[in-house]
């Protein structure tokens, strides 16, 4: 029952975090940010699309937590020390009165099992990993080098030495909390692996700090909500980095492929050649992607002349334009993101309602038990 209560706290906190993500995502459907691969701007994205990725990860975490909850919510009553008892105990009735879904039949495994506990902390560890990954992105986004995310002072601190510093303390704390929980998880699994299927004190040693780590996890989930709420995208900077980082170069190569019928590998070489030429001339800017440069690189790499106006080239390299061209679904295209948001809200609402009903049933059973 204690582990069941712990899972309830974690599930409630996670549901609250998904609500916050939905709220902020709905306000940033067209807020352009650069997506990154290998630490470099890659293609155009949006803040809403990023947040809904986190939202989907949390929904997956909720599924794991729910599965652990189903495993945990079984009654071991009547097993005694693992062999059962001669007392005439109505195990099914007691299980119902305590809000359990079912009874564990095998008297030995109901006492000696540790899988329910390991399943619980595994789900929590994966959830913590989700939180840490988001925190790493947010710290990077807020760095002076990236500078597309601005945290409010309520979740930052300065330096005791360097007064100009504005450190993303609350986001960094999320990563630290994850490290502590992963250490606890490793200890619990190691301890469980050394036990037998018979009851021993070793089986219960990793329970000692269980609630401490659950409380810290719940706080960590709260930090996610807080960091999302107390931050905003520097829209002009983000759009500038997205545009000037040539993140729509892939879209340009795709567009040339569709217009000319040439393979993408070839148009990729043409666009790449244009950008490399500008890099070698120390003139890397989207505005320097000219018709003459396109003509020269297409003749060099393909032996054909591809001619486009300056306006056409600039449109192909416009991040917002490239987003509207996406057709595969699930993309940062605002219409796709809006659709995912609506589906995500519906999924979260369904999970929330199921959880509410389960808690209400258990609460009702416990209240009747007291009566």
Write out the residue ranges for each language-model feature.
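Short, flexible active-site-proximal loops enriched in glycine and acidic residues
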Residues: 20-37, 105-106
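Glycine-rich cofactor/substrate-binding loops
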Residues: 162-371
């Amino acid at each position: 029952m204690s582990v069941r209560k712990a899972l309830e706290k974690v599930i409630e906190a996670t549901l609250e975090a998904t609500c916050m993500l939905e709220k902020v995502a709905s306000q940033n459907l067209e807020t352009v940010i650069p997506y990154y691969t290998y630490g470099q701007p890659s293609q155009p994205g949006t803040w809403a699309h990023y947040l809904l990725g986190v939202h989907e990860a949390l929904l997956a975490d909720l599924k794991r937590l729910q599965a652990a909850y189903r495993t945990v919510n079984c009654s071991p009553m009547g097993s005694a020390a693992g062999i059962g008892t001669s007392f005439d105990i109505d195990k099914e009735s007691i299980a119902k009165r305590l809000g359990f879904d079912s009874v564990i039949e095998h008297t030995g495994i109901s006492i000696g099992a540790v899988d329910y506990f390991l399943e619980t902390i595994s789900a929590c560890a994966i959830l913590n990993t989700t939180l840490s990954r988001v925190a790493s992105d947010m710290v990077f986004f807020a760095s002076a080098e990236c500078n597309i995310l601005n945290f409010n002072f309520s979740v930052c601190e300065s330096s005791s030495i360097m007064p100009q510093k504005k450190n993303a303390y609350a986001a960094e704390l999320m990563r630290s909390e994850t490290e502590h929980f992963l250490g606890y998880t490793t200890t619990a699994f190691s301890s469980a692996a050394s036990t037998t299927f018979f009851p021993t004190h070793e089986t219960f040693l990793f329970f000692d700090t269980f609630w401490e780590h659950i409380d810290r996890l719940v706080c960590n989930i709260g930090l996610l909500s807080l960091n999302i709420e107390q931050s905003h995208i520097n829209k002009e900077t983000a759009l500038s980095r997205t545009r000037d980082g040539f993140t729509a170069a892939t879209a340009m190569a795709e567009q040339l492929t569709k217009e000319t019928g040439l393979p993408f590998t070839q148009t990729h070489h043409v666009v790449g050649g244009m950008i490399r030429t500008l890099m070698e001339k120390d003139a890397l800017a989207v505005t320097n992607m000219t018709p003459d440069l396109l003509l020269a690189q297409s003749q060099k790499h393909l032996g054909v002349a591809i001619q486009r106006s300056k306006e056409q080239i600039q449109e192909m390299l416009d991040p917002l334009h490239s987003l509207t061209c996406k057709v595969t679904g699930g993309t940062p295209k605002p219409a796709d993101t809006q659709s995912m948001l609506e589906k995500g809200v519906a999924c979260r609402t369904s999970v929330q309602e199921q959880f509410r009903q389960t808690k209400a049933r258990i609460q009702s059973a416990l209240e009747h038990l007291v009566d």
